[in-house]
Swiss-Prot record:
Site feature (Interaction with tRNA) residues: 133, 348
Species annotation: Pseudomonas syringae pv. syringae (strain B728a)
SUPFAM superfamilies noted in UniProt: Adenine nucleotide alpha hydrolases-like (SSF52402)
Cellular component terms per the entry's GO annotation: cytoplasm
Protein name, UniProt field: tRNA-specific 2-thiouridylase MnmA
Binding site for ATP: 17-24, 43, 132
Subcellular location: Cytoplasm
Source organism phylogeny: Bacteria, Pseudomonadati, Pseudomonadota, Gammaproteobacteria, Pseudomonadales
């Protein structure tokens, strides 16, 4: 079902988070067609300090302004760079320093787009906010549920799992019922400047730079040895923070005597010894886990876990739903999967679903081996 349109007797004021992309542009158009009083707001979340617009903020603002001018709505601007640094970026650095691989987009949604932006919009007198995320919401039995977007290729519920039901209840998601080609068609129909603009990829504050170059500005590299599972030293790494579980590219391993031609993969980041443990083969047994542990789960709405519960989960964006059993333990939460899960990565998020309902999720802290023989 589509997000509810306002009644004739109550014209609600909605402020749309305008990113300068096609999804938020079309969101504004759809809300206007539904009769809302629509305004836009452009958020700047990163201060470029090197004279180069890596985040393309200037270009994105110009595109957002062009769209707002075209459809005849006001565009506000807000700078949340301080909030982003304190609540997102510093955590991002701490996670890498601890050897984990974080996902800043999830924290950005919780702390910036559905907190700082929401608070700012309410201060401006908005009744609701709206974003161009491919998700849906449903109001039922006095609570608001977060649902997967209708387009399985674009569903973004994975990234919004840490946003609470109260925030979801104040948000409209106009493109959540649409598929991407439909969104672009609407943009072209209305002559929007963003109709053919490419989707943004990667982390905003890194932009076009190489990730290793960016991270090196903030964290000192700590080179160490690359070892096989048998303990043989076969190379050196420039820093564990530059690598992630399941990584194949950029290891600099090759031409080893008596080794097969199978590619090498990162299996373990040994923080205690600053060693990168690698193995050959896409299906190396050390790459697979049967369970994971998270100490804290952010629920969209509270759920009953007085006994183990059958759900599905994703351990990465765009992964298919994986059947699992979730249980509350003394140390947090443990999800046991029906099938082996490849490259379960501490620092990334596990997100739980009940059908199309996104229940919530948490940061992966421990990935348990698929078999007891896999001594990591």
């Amino acid at each position: 079902m589509r997000d509810p349109a306002p009644s004739n007797s109550e014209m609600k004021r909605v402020i749309v988070g305008m990113s300068g992309g096609v999804d938020s542009s079309v969101s504004a158009v759809l809300l206007m067609e539904q009769g809302y009083q629509v305004e836009g707001l452009f958020m700047k979340n990163w201060e470029e300090d090197d004279g180069t617009e890596y985040c393309t903020a200037r270009e994105d603002l110009a595109d957002a302004q062009a769209v707002c001018d075209k459809i005849g709505i006001k565009l506000h601007t807000a700078n949340f760079a301080a909030e982003y640094w304190d609540n997102v970026f510093e955590h991002f650095l701490e996670e890498y320093k601890a050897g984990r691989t974080p996902n800043p987009d999830i924290l950005c949604n919780r702390e910036i787009k559905f907190k700082a932006f929401l608070d700012y919009a309410l201060m401006l007198g908005a009744d609701l906010i709206a974003t161009g995320h491919y998700v849906r919401r449903r109001d039922i039995d006095g609570r608001t549920e977060l649902l997967k977007g209708l387009d399985p290729n674009k569903d973004q519920s994975y990234f919004l799992h840490a946003v609470g039901g109260e925030q979801i209840a104040r948000t409209l998601f106009p493109v959540g019922e649409l598929e991407k080609p439909e969104v672009r068609a609407i943009a072209e129909k209305h002559g929007l400047a963003t109709a053919k603009k490419k989707d943004s990829t990667g982390i905003c504050f890194i932009g076009e730079r190489r990730f290793t170059d960016f991270l090196r500005q903030y964290l000192p590299a700590q080179p160490g040895e690359i070892k096989t599972t048998e303990g043989e030293v076969i190379g050196r790494h420039s820093g564990l923070m530059y690598h992630t579980i399941g990584q194949r590219q950029g290891l600099g391993i090759g031409g080893l005597k008596d080794a097969s031609d199978d590619p090498w993969y990162v299996l373990v980041k040994d923080l205690e010894n600053n060693e990168l443990i690698v193995g050959q083969g896409n299906d190396h047994p050390w790459l697979f886990s049967r369970a994971l542990v998270s100490s804290e789960i952010y629920w969209v709405n509270p759920i009953d876990l007085s006994s183990p519960r059958r759900l599905t989960a994703k351990v990465r964006y765009r992964q298919g739903d994986q059947p699992c059993t979730l249980e509350k333990t003394a140390d947090g939460y443990r999800a046991t999967f029906d099938d082996p899960q490849r490259a379960v990565t501490p620092g990334q998020s596990v997100v739980f679903y009940d059908g199309e309902i996104c229940l919530g999720g948490g940061v992966i802290e421990i990935a348990e081996p698929w078999t007891t023989k896999d001594k990591r």
